[in-house]
A protein has these predicted regions:
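Conserved NTP-donor binding/palm subdomain of two-metal-ion nucleotidyltransferases/polymerases, i.e.
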Residues: 1-115, 121-386
């Protein structure tokens, strides 16, 4: 495993005091590949090291922070409009992930870029909300019949919807794991105690987010069921910042996590979160967390393989971290993610169908492609003359 410079800085920010121009250039490139330039600024500010950053690097980081601030303003505007809609429909929507961090004003929101607004609804409310959104200029991003059926029959969400005017994307969930998953979660155990946020000055209606323990576990479940980990290091950093904040603000937070993980049968996701926060970011765990990790690892399946995957992929996905171990780990993670998402009896037909559709689409385009190539090829005209 190649330890990236970015991880070294996350582990021990003070090392930047000894950086030369080449080190700074590499750090910025690795942070960009991990979608973490603004997050890097957050860590350096928290360590009171921002004054040690060269002006050129600081200018780039500041520009990323401006982009994030603009995004956050847009999200607040979208949420206000969505809340008005949900209020008319008498529906309590729970915001998830990046949007939730922003609405709850968590430290994690600082420097965090996210591409869509994630919402959790009761499954029997989705049809009503989907119709209402379409009336307000939102449309499904997936128009293919196979993709529509895939999402609606097997997944934990409907196809993403995009606003035709503003380009904003909404992911509407009714669970946090695919419904065809063998370890499906009773989502009511997470949503029942959702927190009401009615102190956001720019919003007319209240917003709802998960409790701290549910929020952390959802982030962990999402990360450790993922098959493509280009932003895996950022996901692990999310968990690190959430844990730091909630350990200070909540009483017995480690026990809260363990209790909830047992209720929803996600002890493994909690185990992975604590294990790789410690192994990759060198985070010191609470005594309770250490005991849980020590006990659970005795029964954790395929731990050597899982360690190989995550210790190699929780890094900047950059040319300077490339290795054969990284490539193998990426393939293993890809197929692991597929198998966690769908059982083989569903996965194989799904992949065969997708391959057939892609091949059919390519075949349709191929004649036009060949004709264009022939028309540009001087040899074609020469043969024609002969």
């Amino acid at each position: 495993m190649v330890t990236s410079l970015l991880i070294q800085v996350l582990q021990e920010p003070a090392i930047i005091r000894h950086f030369n121009a080449s080190d700074w250039n590499l750090l910025l490139r690795q942070a960009s590949s991990a979608k973490m330039p603004a997050r890097l600024a957050y860590h350096l500010k928290a360590a009171d090291l921002i004054n040690a950053v060269p002006d050129k690097i600081l200018n780039h980081i500041n520009s990323e922070q401006v982009k994030v601030a603009h995004l956050h303003t847009q999200v607040h505007q979208e949420v206000q409009a969505l809340n008005q809609l949900f209020n008319k429909l008498d529906i309590k929507a729970i915001y998830l992930k990046g949007t939730a961090y922003l609405l709850a004003d968590l430290p994690l929101a600082q420097g965090r870029f996210f591409s869509d607004i994630d919402i959790l609804l009761n499954q029997d409310e989705i049809a009503k909300v989907e119709i209402a959104l379409k009336c307000q200029g939102w449309k499904s991003q997936k128009t293919d019949d196979h993709d529509q059926a895939y999402y609606r029959n097997y997944m934990h969400e409907i196809p993403p919807m995009q606003n035709i005017m503003r380009g904003t994307v909404i992911d509407i969930h009714h669970n946090i794991l695919p419904v065809c998953n063998d370890n499906i979660i009773d989502i009511s155990l997470l949503s029942v105690d959702a927190l009401k946020l009615d102190n956001i000055s720019t919003h007319c209606q209240p917003s709802y987010v998960l409790t701290p323990a549910a929020m952390f576990l959802h982030s962990a479940i999402h990360l450790f069921h993922e098959g493509e980990l280009e932003q895996g290091l950022r996901g692990l950093s999310d968990l690190d910042i959430l844990l730091s904040h909630f350990e200070e603000s909540e009483t017995n937070f480690s026990n809260q996590l363990i209790d909830l993980a047992k209720k929803i049968n996600q002890q493994q996701s909690l185990f992975y979160a604590w294990r790789y926060l410690n192994k990759v970011l060198k985070r010191k765990l609470s005594t309770t967390a250490q005991a849980f990790v020590g006990d659970y690892q005795q029964q954790a399946p395929n731990l050597a393989t899982i360690d190989f995957i995550f210790t190699n992929l929780f890094t900047a996905h950059h040319s300077t971290t490339a290795s054969w171990q990284f490539s193998v780990a990426a393939q293993l993670a890809y197929w692991r993610g597929h198998l966690l998402r769908m059982p083989l009896r569903l996965l194989i037909p799904h992949l065969m169908k997708k391959s057939w559709l892609q091949l059919s689409e390519l075949t349709k385009k191929e004649p036009d492609k060949i004709n264009k190539v022939d028309a540009l090829d001087p040899r074609f005209h020469q043969l024609d003359k002969e």
